[in-house]
Amino acid sequence: ERQPLVANLDLLIIVTDPTGDFSIRRVERYVEALASGCDAPVVLAVNKADTVDDAETRAAEARSAIPGLDAVAISARTGTGIAELRTRWSPGDTVVLAGSSGVGKSTLVNVLCGTAAETGDLRGDGRGMHKTTTRRAYVTDDGALLVDTPGLREVGLYSEEGSAGTAF
């Protein structure tokens, strides 16, 4: 079933992690599908930088593969890169977190908002368990509206009848 992710956003943050499941092709698909038809800037947040030695390398790979992409290595657990990520929005902005299950979106919400969004353990294979099942908005401590979204299983492009001509 097709479901629009969110509307009226000012910034889209695609959250990923730098582990063995990291895929530039997935990042490209997310950027293309989620940012298509959207004037909001996109930032790739390579979360869990505290778990590997090459998180910044992954961010650089993404910047190289996707011209114009803003990418930053962060750790919601240790706070690495969080101050830099916060510079991407202003008070009153609507900021959307999107990405696969288990990449730390809800943990990032907790850091940015000082709230207690439910988080979960990873399965034995390192994948998330889809703890977030609905979109939910929070207010960051600097006054932005932060929307936490469920883990994406797949993304794609679609258009309303008659709108294909504007996309191509």
Task: Mark where each language-model region is.
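Helix-rich effector regions associated with P-loop NTPase G domains
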Residues: 1-12, 16-18, 23-25, 32-43, ...
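Short amphipathic alpha-helical segments
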Residues: 25-28, 56-59, 110, 158-161
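Short, contiguous clusters of charged residues that form electrostatic/catalytic patches at enzyme active sites
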Residues: 25-29, 80-83
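Canonical P-loop GTPase G-domain recognition
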Residues: 50-103
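Walker A/P-loop
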Residues: 101, 105-107, 111
